[in-house]
Amino acid sequence: MKNILFFLIVCISLTSCKDSHANSVEVPVTYTNDTTNMVYLTYSGTSVSAVVCENIKNYVTITSTGSHVRVIQSPNVGLSTGEIGYELTGTSENGSFYMEGAYKSTVGLRALTLTNPNGPAIDIQNGKRVEISIKRDTENTLTDGTSTAVDAWKGCLQCKGHVEFKGYGTLNVYGNYANAIWSKEYMTVRNCTINVLKAVKDGINCNQYFTMESGVVNISGQGDDGISVGLKNNDTSAENTGSFTMTGGTININPSGASGTAVNALGNQSVASSATLNTSWTQSASNVSDGGKSVKVLREGQVLIIRNGRTYTPNGNLINN
């Protein structure tokens, strides 16, 4: 009898430790006849409410523990349904957004202030294309915590797939545990303003490649690299793997006592004349620079500076016309 009782106690203990969403409840949902495939989530302190388009109600399951929202997207979402969009707004000092799916999606941020003391503020477990739409003229702030009460995480905003940041708003990110922004695959930035204000590790950490087309990225308060670009699945032969490219926009990186480099890419780096990369890093023997643009290149990569349609090496040698 004692052995049976001990076994039951252990089982209950293990179950409660493993399932952090055991006490989650369904989020109050208002359905709308709109057919735009949207889910609207409004955070308000320790609670959250949802508005869901009627045509996709059978394709999303929304639960929460307080303001910690968990969205599970049906595996049946695909070409016939179209992608589902999520728009987050409101404020919570103890909340988060978790989304799990297997088809491309868009997550919009509209005047959102979200802090998770025990994990990432936004956690997207979707290996497809995920667009982060920062809504026009809005300021959004994400902050994670320092507690390891849950499984370790890699970024205040983290994504399993490839992330495309777009929009004409502002996103502020405080990474108090690891990186501020982390993506398992590639990352692109267009039009928006991203301010990384703190990162225990890298300001931005992604794999495959990083491309800046337009907009502004400001990085400060990081403990290691400003931007780190790794390989895709450690495949050194994959196209564009580990590359850093700027075709436009502005990136400002302040070392803030960091031990890393401004840009640490495992592949080639290219900065066009229409783009600006500013850093106050002190150049070291392992770095190359162009006008103070300090970068680190590994895996026999190279830095290309493009001016007026011509490509140069950092020391000014013309490669092609």
Locations of the language-model features?
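Generic alpha-helical secondary structure signal
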Residues: V10-C11, T35, S47, G316
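A composition-driven surface/loop motif
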Residues: K18-N287
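C-terminal motif of bacterial Sec signal peptides marking the signal peptidase cleavage site
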Residues: S13-S16
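Positively charged n-region of N-terminal signal peptides that target proteins for export
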Residues: M1-I4, K18-D19
